[in-house]
């Protein structure tokens, strides 16, 4: 069983129940899924750019991403509806916990001059969004094989009803929020 999941069940659930006075164990907020999205704007002119992004996302998450397509045509971006413009992965269960564990303990500390992540990126419904500027912070990515620095969005979806509960859940899991 995953380290983070074990910690959640043994330590986090009791402490959250105590803090927010939940009536049952099922009311305690938990992680639902983590969505990792990589928008590849270059894919419009160069279809090969997307293949590389898909490959990198697969290495980072251990799961094959789906290719996202443009919903609308935008002439300013030379974009037609249905063109592939990105890739995303939805992680649940074991893989989700593994990814979060790796993100907290390995990847985030590797960010240049890292001082913690913003406390303000909650959406009001207990979900947290985090932007990663470069894919190099993940240990699976080999620096020499990278053709271009790409960023990505990581959305952590929890069952918490308020931001405060979600913040408490994530910080007990070890998310390095700014003091």
From Swiss-Prot:
GO terms for cellular component: ribonucleoprotein complex; ribosome. GO terms for molecular function: rRNA binding; structural constituent of ribosome; tRNA binding. It comes from the Bacteria. InterPro entries: Ribosomal_uL5, Ribosomal_uL5_bac-type, Ribosomal_uL5_C, Ribosomal_uL5_CS, Ribosomal_uL5_dom_sf, Ribosomal_uL5_N. Keywords: Ribonucleoprotein, Ribosomal protein, RNA-binding, rRNA-binding, tRNA-binding. One of its GO terms (biological process) is translation. SUPFAM superfamilies: RL5-like. Pfam families: Ribosomal_L5, Ribosomal_L5_C. The keyword Endoplasmic reticulum does not apply. Coiled coil: none annotated. This is one of the proteins that bind and probably mediate the attachment of the 5S RNA into the large ribosomal subunit, where it forms part of the central protuberance. In the 70S ribosome it contacts protein S13 of the 30S subunit (bridge B1b), connecting the 2 subunits; this bridge is implicated in subunit movement. Contacts the P site tRNA; the 5S rRNA and some of its associated proteins might help stabilize positioning of ribosome-bound tRNAs. Belongs to the universal ribosomal protein uL5 family. PANTHER family: 60S RIBOSOMAL PROTEIN L11-RELATED. NCBIfam families: PRK00010.1. HAMAP family: Ribosomal_uL5_B (MF_01333_B). Part of the 50S ribosomal subunit; part of the 5S rRNA/L5/L18/L25 subcomplex. Contacts the 5S rRNA and the P site tRNA. Forms a bridge to the 30S subunit in the 70S ribosome. This is Large ribosomal subunit protein uL5.
